[in-house]
Amino acid sequence: MSIEIPAGLTELLQGFTVEVLRHQPADLLEFALQHFTRLQQENERKGAARFGHEGRTWGDAGAAAGGGIPSKGVNFAEEPMRSDSENGEEEEAAEAGAFNAPVINRFTRRASVCAEAYNPDEEEDDAESRIIHPKTDDQRNRLQEACKDILLFKNLDPEQMSQVLDAMFEKLVKEGEHVIDQGDDGDNFYVIDRGTFDIYVKCDGVGRCVGNYDNRGSFGELALMYNTPRAATITATSPGALWGLDRVTFRRIIVKNNAKKRKMYESFIESLPFLKSLEVSERLKVVDVIGTKVYNDGEQIIAQGDLADSFFIVESGEVKITMKRKGKSEVEENGAVEIARCFRGQYFGELALVTNKPRAASAHAIGTVKCLAMDVQAFERLLGPCMEIMKRNIATYEEQLVALFGTNMDIVEPTA
């Protein structure tokens, strides 16, 4: 007998489990009643404004046109599948249409019905023996280059990163080869060294290509992080090479580190007013994908005119926002005038992501600054419910610019 798991059930139960572990309620039944009642009320309040509904207004035009923001090596179809890392393979896509799917290997591994429980707090650092795959200097250099922009690795300390690099192994693939298959157990996390790959998702027995990778990116993390079967099939469309990280090492280092990061940033993220519209499970995902960046006094964080690839939240310190405008006497020596300052809990860098245009201003650190950074893909995927708040801020920005420059600097209107 085949039992189909309803869409959204896994995420719903994961969010509830996290809340139970956080609060340790004495009356579990009463806690469950309050938790799901609150979720229902939040859902009713959001209504059609929820991200992904037909009524959404943000980003549609920019997404359809391809925008001007680099996609970090992964390109999505018109109704993209959305994931938790470098636009990987692990979340459900939009309803799929008919297509000629590639032939799937019939001798695939058994799909998981239930995965083992895992508590990162209870596992000792030396519980598992270290895994080391010897590498040549050339392989090590290529591996470091492939991993330098992987968000999951951003918060690892040097010793943890060294263990990850030691444990990764090279996997050569041929054109047409299936790297992972939807429904299989998660065994490895993969980082792309070279090659192109298509992402296929099957829905109601019908498969569809929902995106592709072009010589960079990573996939396979969510099946390992959340103990769920693979949610997509990744097929090589050219000869290529991958770096794989086994399940044991991934969970020992990455998942444990992620759990520590959750403890550190959960309360901070929950305190941010502009994220109040997110559900608990959505805020936890924000914690999972953010990276930490530290800037020294005077260091540039973003530059006016650059393409936008990240969104920033100030954790500590002070950030100065400046804009260049020729012909004004009150500008600083570098031709820029200060228009704002950001402090703890405030954000910047969202304007270029909301408007799909290059950076409208520059940002510099005043003293030592620590920021939480989120890449553009995660920003679009996770902060949909907050987008209306951010769009309302554009009017405030325009008023400030008119007062300073006599014009709104065309921060919203598309350029020719």
From Swiss-Prot:
3',5'-cyclic AMP 1 binds at residues 152-273. It comes from the Eukaryota. One of its GO terms (cellular component) is perinuclear region of cytoplasm. Phosphorylated by the activated catalytic chain. Residues 1-151 are annotated as: Dimerization and phosphorylation. The keyword Cell inner membrane does not apply. Four types of regulatory chains are found: I-alpha, I-beta, II-alpha, and II-beta. Their expression varies among tissues and is in some cases constitutive and in others inducible. InterPro entries: cAMP-dep_PK_reg_su-like (IPR050503), cAMP_dep_PK_reg_su (IPR012198), cAMP_dep_PK_reg_su_I/II_a/b (IPR003117), cNMP-bd_CS (IPR018488), cNMP-bd_dom (IPR000595), cNMP-bd_dom_sf (IPR018490), RmlC-like_jellyroll (IPR014710). 3',5'-cyclic AMP 2 binds at residues 274-416. It is found in: Cytoplasm; Cell membrane. Keywords: cAMP, cAMP-binding, Cell membrane, Cytoplasm, Membrane, Nucleotide-binding, Phosphoprotein, Repeat. GO terms for biological process: fatty acid metabolic process; learning; modulation of chemical synaptic transmission; negative regulation of cAMP/PKA signal transduction; response to antipsychotic drug. GO terms for molecular function: cAMP binding; cAMP-dependent protein kinase inhibitor activity; cAMP-dependent protein kinase regulator activity; protein domain specific binding; protein kinase A catalytic subunit binding; protein kinase binding; ubiquitin protein ligase binding. The keyword Phosphoprotein applies. The modification Phosphoserine is found at S83, S85, S112. It holds the Pfam family RIIa. Belongs to the cAMP-dependent kinase regulatory chain family. The inactive form of the enzyme is composed of two regulatory chains and two catalytic chains. Activation by cAMP produces two active catalytic monomers and a regulatory dimer that binds four cAMP molecules. Interacts with PRKACA and PRKACB. Interacts with the phosphorylated form of PJA2. Forms a complex composed of PRKAR2B, GSK3B and GSKIP through GSKIP interaction; facilitates PKA-induced phosphorylation and regulates GSK3B activity. Regulatory subunit of the cAMP-dependent protein kinases involved in cAMP signaling in cells. Type II regulatory chains mediate membrane association by binding to anchoring proteins, including the MAP2 kinase. This is cAMP-dependent protein kinase type II-beta regulatory subunit. It comes from Mus musculus (Mouse).
